[in-house]
A protein has these predicted regions:
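Short, flexible helix-loop junctions that flank or precede catalytic/ligand sites
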Residues: 1-350
């Protein structure tokens, strides 16, 4: 069986974003969204266990045994940096590797809209980047952090599980804390961050009521807070945040969110027309007066209408972004319909 380094290098040469190791089949890699079997022997329990032992410290292995899963990062010189999730299945070890890369892409390279890039200048408020797993949320946030780092005198604290992109101290001071190593959980790390004189706080994921509550408070008290949610679309994102809270608190949270939210950016990665790459589609909602009123009044279902009538402010719905990609020839009709929020309407538009 080849070493994990050989497997990951081969996958990178093939343009893979992810590599999966599990017992009973050869290693698999994901290329442009498609899962492909690699040309290696089937993996035995001893093979995946050996990979685990080689990439983890003793402390990390102990935590893996306790929890049954473990998130970490792993680097190979002259190859790349990987986000790794190790987990148990049928009593054996399985691992998922995601290539992160060593250089933070610029927003322009990612195709991030200019109105989103400009968010790096904000001094306070809540910015949410949302989308399904593997849609590039953490890369978009890393690009915004890098923009801040290159252009602002700021103290940036990132809370990540695990740390993906490594930021050097440039114009800003960037302190990166890994959940499970530098702090026990997001909520505790976020509370501590408020006592560490930050200007900008990145929360890798708003997973629970406690973290969301502290994040909103942090944005209220004069910090720029950046985070992610696994939602698609501004309306579902607002609803998700509100619904985390018990009914008797929801009106208060609507008011707080309407005052603190700066923008919601939702993204999806869509296969290109030639099938060789993927291109990002971005929905962008900036919190202007109309948006804040709708959030306060619990009328999130009307947010799409505000976005459609405020294109000049940099707003765009997901389906409008997909239509734009289609008419630019970047994606085909089938993919446009498949990734649309309203497939029936999309069929009529294209």
């Amino acid at each position: 069986m080849p070493t994990i380094e050989e497997i990951l290098r081969a996958a990178k040469e093939a343009g893979a974003s992810d590599v999966h190791l599990t017992v009973g089949i050869p290693p698999n890699m994901r290329v442009n969204g498609n899962l492909i079997t690699m040309d290696y022997p089937k993996m035995l329990p001893a093979d995946t266990l050996e990979v685990l032992v080689n990439i983890m410290t003793e402390v990390q292995r102990e935590r893996f045994e306790e929890r049954g899963e473990y998130d970490m990062s792993f680097s190979i010189p002259n190859c790349g940096r990987y986000r790794v999730n190790a987990y148990k299945q049928r009593g054996s070890v399985a691992l998922a590797f995601r290539l992160v890369g060593t250089k933070v892409p610029s927003p322009e390279e990612l195709g991030v809209p200019e109105s989103v890039i400009d968010l790096y200048q904000r001094k306070r408020g809540l910015v949410l980047v949302t989308g399904p797993t593997g849609s590039g949320k953490s890369t978009t946030l890393a690009a915004i952090i890098d923009k801040i780092n290159n252009n602002r005198d700021a103290h940036v604290i990132t809370l990540e599980d695990p740390i993906e992109y490594l930021h050097q101290h440039k114009m800003s001071m960037v302190n990166q804390r890994e959940i499970g190593i530098d702090s026990n959980n997001y909520a505790n790390a976020l509370r501590a961050a408020l006592r560490e004189d930050p200007d900008v706080i990145l929360v890798g994921e708003m997973r629970d009521f406690e973290t969301i509550s502290v994040a909103i408070t942090a944005a209220e008290t004069g910090h720029l807070v950046l985070s992610t949610l696994h939602t698609i679309g501004a309306a579902s994102t607002v609803d998700r945040v509100i619904d985390v809270f018990p009914p008797h608190q929801q009106q208060q949270i609507r008011v707080q969110l309407s005052n603190t939210l700066e923008a919601v950016i939702s993204q999806q990665l869509i296969p290109t027309a030639d099938g060789k790459h993927r291109v990002a589609a971005f929905e962008v909602m900036h919190a202007n007066h109309a948006v804040r009123n709708l959030i306060r009044e619990g009328k999130s279902h009307q947010l799409a209408s505000v976005m459609q009538t405020n294109r000049k402010l940099g707003m765009i719905t997901m389906d409008e972004a997909i239509v734009q990609l289609y008419f630019e020839g970047k994606i085909d009709r089938e993919q446009a319909i498949q990734f649309a929020q309203d497939p029936d309407s999309m069929e009529n538009k294209i």
